[in-house]
Amino acid sequence: MERDFLGAIGRKEEAAGKPEEHSDYRGGGGGASAAMQWQFPATKVGAASSAFMSFRSSAAAAREEDPKEAAVFDRFSLSGFRPPPRPSPGDAFDGAAAMKQRQFGFNGRQQYAAAAQHGHREQGVDSYGVAAPHHFPSPSPSPRHPVPFGHANPMLRVHSLPNVAGGSPYRNQSFSVGNSVAGSTVGVYGGPRDLQNPKVTQMTIFYDGLVNVFDNIPVEKAQELMLLASRASIPSPPSAARKSDSPISAAAKLTVPEALPARQIVVQKPEASVPLVSGVSNPITIVSQAVTLPKSSSSSNDSAGPKSGGLPLAVTPLSQASPSQPIPVATTNASAIMPRAVPQARKASLARFLEKRKERVSSVAPYPSSKSPLESSDTIGSPSTPSKSSCTDITPSTNNCEDSLCLGQPRNISFSSQEPPSTKLQI
């Protein structure tokens, strides 16, 4: 039935003629009113075609006759767009072309641009032709989404309302891929929102097997703490060790003023006197060293005499030292400080040992011999033979009771308790 109607329209076009057709186009372009009569009788097909009638150019109507191009046109069309029909009298279009014009695709932009040149601007066609490139973006990848959307996406459809005042078409807000408002923010750094995170910082300190976490620690405070920790990790100089021994040195100075060099010897080796005192390998050598000690140092403290054996080889024996050589003061002071380093139990055992040795010496030789001290020192060197002049040697190093016992016996050398003994041992 379409073919018969198409043929009827073709015959009436030939009868109308081309000048009349051009005059109709000029009348339509002159802004004619919408109340115009349709010159063809209203049939079923004609009524259906007139409802969807739109403006077309002659070149577009010629291309509609090609079936291949029409198939491509229908394939890429958007069915949502319905342009308002504004027919003009004497406009000779075929009904089949009007049925196919219900939808328009990418060719529609060219058709409406051509129709806009003929003066059909009051129906919003020109505005759509200008805005069409924005609604149909090119398939070039956008900076945020590398995969473009398809052109047949329903989000890209543009709908028009023919009843809007002013005759301008109504277009929905389409979704644009590169829109800055509705664009995706995946992978985009949000600067203002993340600027507050560096202010809330935490500091973790591992100390003494504990983990300490502190909040809101600025960078300057953390650097200051690390600087203090680095200073504390440096080993202390040797002067700190000397300061720690200051109470001991003060006590030693109260007892003996010259005790500073002797104190260092005692602190370094406090246990050196234990094996030498307990051993009885050379007791006479120890006693022979005590001969040159002054009387005041031995009588000032009762226990100074027995503890004088704590210095094993600090003083040379009488056989090696000259008669006029005095003993250093540090050695005498060390003998006075030595009881402080020895415990009380060892002090008692040492006192018992010295008493028994004194009894053995007095029982072997109760009377002193007339030999010189130099000759007696030769016999002192041998541990097997006891010395006969041991009473003279032991007397200064013992306590007061020993002095009274030995002073009652006849001696060649006499010591006075009021004056220090002389270093000359000649008769």
UniProtKB/Swiss-Prot annotation:
Superkingdom: Eukaryota
Residue ranges, compositional bias (Polar residues): 293-303, 317-327, 369-402, 411-427
Segments of this protein annotated with the region Disordered: 1-33, 293-327, 360-427
Gene Ontology biological process terms, A to Z: regulation of defense response; regulation of jasmonic acid mediated signaling pathway; response to wounding
A Pfam family matched in the record: tify
Disulfide bonds: none
Motif Jas: where in chain: 343-367
Compositionally skewed regions (Basic and acidic residues) per UniProt: 1-25
GO cellular component: nucleus
PROSITE patterns cross-referenced by the UniProt entry: TIFY
Entry's localization field: Nucleus
Domain Tify: 196-231
Changes after translation: Ubiquitinated.
Keywords noted in UniProt: Jasmonic acid signaling pathway, Nucleus, Transcription, Transcription regulation, Ubl conjugation
Keyword Ubl conjugation: yes
Motif (Nuclear localization signal): 345-352
Role of this protein: Repressor of jasmonate responses.
Domains as described in the record: The jas domain (343-367) is required for interaction with COI1.
Family: Belongs to the TIFY/JAZ family.
Protein name, per record: Protein TIFY 6a
Organism: Oryza sativa subsp. indica
Higher taxonomy: Eukaryota, Viridiplantae, Streptophyta, Embryophyta, Tracheophyta
